[in-house]
């Protein structure tokens, strides 16, 4: 976890944290750093960064649940970026992501392992069990999550979410 009060990492980059920044949840600490680098070049700011590693104790779903249950519309970031290697509890992800979106949040996510090569890479990295790509697509669509396929796309979509709505 990294936020305005705690930086529990040993590598760079460590971004400056801002209350109005993006919440970022990653299934991989190393991949999180690559995504942070991409985001910083676009001027994207962070409110918090969470890495759940191989999700043996908690996964992306539990962090989303925590954010949903404790959401403060005045103080909390309304933009969430997710890098997911496996979805262990799709119902939990659907419920809490949908709830956050109804509360005014925007969520963009990469689901790693959408190709055969990607499935092997995710499995060898964290032991992730591959989810069906069509099931992931349906889950994201139903929840309202914007699906991305690269770190550049993820950080670009999150950057777009930060723009003020044109009326």
Per-region residue spans from a language model:
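Catalytic-core regions of core metabolic enzymes
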Residues: 1-167
